[in-house]
Amino acid sequence: MTILTHTLGFPRVGLRRELKKAQESYWAGNSTREALLAVGRELRARHWEQQKQAGIDLLPVGDFAWYDHVLTTSLLLGNVPARHQNNDGSVDIDTLFRIGRGRAPTGEPAAAAEMTKWFNTNYHYIVPEFSKGQQFRLTWTQLLEEVDEALALGHKIKPVLLGPVTYLWLGKVKGEPFDRLTLLKDILPVYQHVLAELAKRGIEWVQIDELALVLELPQAWLDAFKPAYDALAGQVKLLLTTYFEGVTPNLDTIIALPAQGLHVDLIHGKDDVAELHQRLPVDWLLSAGLINGRNVWRADLTEKYAQINALVGKRALWVASSCSLLHSPIDLSVETRLDTEVKSWFAFALQKCGELALLRDALNSGETAALEEWSAPIQARRHSRRVHNAAVEKRLAAITAQDSQRENPYEVRAEAQRARFKLPAWPTTTIGSFPQTTEIRGLRLDFKKGNLDANNYRTGIAEHIKQAIIEQERLGLDVLVHGEAERNDMVEYFGEHLDGFVFTQNGWVQSYGSRCVKPPVVIGDISRPAPITVEWAKYAQSLTDKPVKGMLTGPVTILCWSFPREDVTRETIAKQIALALRDEVADLEAAGIGIIQIDEPALREGLPLRRSDWDAYLEWGVEAFRINAAVAKDETQIHTHMCYCEFNDIMDSIVALDADVITIETSRSDMELLESFEAFDYPNEIGPGVYDIHSPNVPSVEWIEALLKKAAQRIPAQRLWVNPDCGLKTRGWPETRAALANMVKAAHNLRQAK
């Protein structure tokens, strides 16, 4: 039985972010739909060929998405919210963009669908909306068209589908409450139709992603798998695909299904390969996810070989990435500025494909010399002086309980803060960033390339900060921000100023839609050699009598949005970052900054997928935040910001953060998230986001007032703040001014209505 290689998916955006540029050009009206579609075709063809050349035997098709693969599945099923539908009932790419963004070059603008995190990653998906009695039909044939493309190019392929049970699990009911699982019988005919079309094209295997099978599901959902897959069986071979966790707890459900193979994540799961082999049906193929799709580290292939070699010849076996390579940058070979030693520790998506090919060849032949050669830099790294810092390790070991305690409880601090700031009712603020204009990006790029000296760069940044303060004072905001003109990314900026991180030139990964991020890589112990944000915060405060917030990214978010080390625990990394940023809080306070925001949007996304593992994570995650913040005096107000979150199941931990003010993203969920805070009787102040910054639509004063009144039904008005959902970095100034003016007006109206 010859072992084959495959990947579960490949990065979509292109090495130079070609997809992002084509999307944004099309949205802005600067290019045609045909030009956008052509870029997609070119990227798919290139990526298939690159994977093939790197040694992948079965290429994934259907992993490409114009915005997000869950949204693609919604269109496949004809699940289009009424507000986004075309008058004639047709579905096109602008339908997709209206659902994701709220607007597109054609069609009427409408509220974008809710967006949330894809399991415990920093990728986002558009949440499917379900209503009672909903009908489904095949309306979007993107998958079939891409299969035809790949077949025409002569590739051996494996189409990828999001499974029906997981699709329903990821969605939300809108309107009259009902059990969305009852829709399963209605979407299965569409899946049957798609599988029949694939069978007509000679497809042998289909990868069907059922990530819900790694979760602690209610019994009714587990019971739904058998009848669903009984309905889907028989047309093609189904590779039941799971990742991000192990499957052993749900293995009884899995082995009862009429599938022909199972993919397991052997990186993030705790599954025992021998047990899987023993319990799986003898005729099932096992796809072993041995290469980590979520990081940038070179794999120890000798270790991977030892892990799986015992199964060679005993059952059909494929070797694969643990999950889609969507979460990894594309190609390490173009990183020309990385230190040679550090570069030898890494592998990006194409290199991971090469790792799979090396592993396949060794397993098929029994020859392991190439694996040992590939793995040599990993052994060298364990002893590198770039990894270990004795002073950091000593400070970490000396942490005590007192280091995570503010001087006094919230009630005492709140009195001191009210006396200091004298803010009005319904105080208005923003979350931190202002539009990153072409001028700002050009300024940073010129400085980075050496075309601008430090003095001229600083003068330019200072001018943009000054303009941000002027804009906010004109608008009448109560608590200001400096706008973050000097920051390229909320995590990358801090990583650039902390020892223990390195950066790539082209290490882009998709976050959502056209948004890409370039995560820093944690290669060693973390420390702060000098203040990071103090200079610009102090300058901004000198320009106004109103309070200006200091802006920090919190330790858990920096951890979650970086590629972490694999030789120490995530807890260790988070606490090292917390200690470094604790010193930053102290320095901001000493510089006269009275309000300091520590953003933790990733706190919930870092949760383990199984609830039984949550407590340990939340304990150290909360402790890291408190270590970061607890150095602040009573009269210093600590804010935190979170987004895309469901809070009801972690409210104990949200309260335990002990932030004086929390701002959250609520507008897309129509203030639904506040139910958690109301039910828990959240004791501190809260700023529910009143408009969606991910959409270019400008909210009306009436819309914002209505949301705030709804918020005041759940949270006492004297503890409410008024703010957008998130930072304004990706928006333009015209819509930003208009939206903030309406937000301030709504707050003033509510003050006068008291």
Curated annotation (Swiss-Prot):
Q: Which GO terms describe its biological process?
A: methionine biosynthetic process; methylation
| Pathway(s) this gene product operates in, as recorded in its UniProt entry | Amino-acid biosynthesis; L-methionine biosynthesis via de novo pathway; L-methionine from L-homocysteine (MetE route): step 1/1
Q: Which reaction is the catalytic activity of this chain?
A: 5-methyltetrahydropteroyltri-L-glutamate + L-homocysteine = tetrahydropteroyltri-L-glutamate + L-methionine
Residues where L-methionine binds: I431, G432, S433, E484, D599
Write down the EC number. Answer: 2.1.1.14
Co-factor remark: Binds 1 zinc ion per subunit.
List, alphabetically, the Pfam families matched: Meth_synt_1, Meth_synt_2
Quote the catalytic residue positions. H694
Q: Which HAMAP family match?
A: Meth_synth
Main function: Catalyzes the transfer of a methyl group from 5-methyltetrahydrofolate to homocysteine resulting in methionine formation.
Note the PANTHER family from the entry: 5-METHYLTETRAHYDROPTEROYLTRIGLUTAMATE--HOMOCYSTEINE METHYLTRANSFERASE
Question: What is the protein's name according to its record?
Answer: 5-methyltetrahydropteroyltriglutamate--homocysteine methyltransferase
Q: Which organism is it from?
A: Salmonella paratyphi A (strain AKU_12601)
